[in-house]
Amino acid sequence: MKLHELQPAPGSRKKAVRVGRGIGSGNGKTSGRGQKGQNARSGGGVRLGFEGGQTPLFRRLPKRGFTNINRKEYAVVNLEKLNRFEDGTEVTPELLLETGVISKLKSGVKILGKGQIEKKLTVKAHKFSASAKEAIEAAGGKTEVI
């Protein structure tokens, strides 16, 4: 195969439809837009969600809930991810960020209890689930709430 022999996959390239170029083309005169009306005009068409004057769905449905401005979102780390550290390491949010375990600090770090932990670690985080705290201490490690 040579560069000049390369061809696009069959059916992957479509020829542009040239509208308004005579009635014999099948897309002449009104260019496939039908007769008069909003959609035949330039810039014509209805806005997103418009239902012809009928009250649109988003206004028929009731409002619900609110956004809590005080919401805190924690970066979640499961126990199984902590096994990558050496025995006796002090695991801090900064270390987790450095090693790529978490991508952003957000409002802090929360350690959850999914998986097993085989290393003896000192873990410093903003929150711990009960099962995570139990598992870290059972492995001989320490937990510290920042």
Curated annotation (Swiss-Prot):
Gene3D superfamilies from the UniProt entry: 3.100.10.10
UniProtKB keywords: Ribonucleoprotein, Ribosomal protein, RNA-binding, rRNA-binding
Source organism: Geobacillus stearothermophilus
Location of the region described as Disordered in the Swiss-Prot/TrEMBL record: 1-51
Coiled coil spans: none
Gene Ontology biological process: translation
GO molecular function, one term: rRNA binding
InterPro entries given in the database record: Ribosomal_uL15, Ribosomal_uL15/eL18, Ribosomal_uL15/eL18_sf, Ribosomal_uL15_bac-type, Ribosomal_uL15_CS
Function statement: Binds to the 23S rRNA.
Compositional bias annotation for Gly residues: 21-35, 42-51
GO cellular component: cytosolic large ribosomal subunit
Name of the protein in its database record: Large ribosomal subunit protein uL15
Domain of life of the native organism: Bacteria
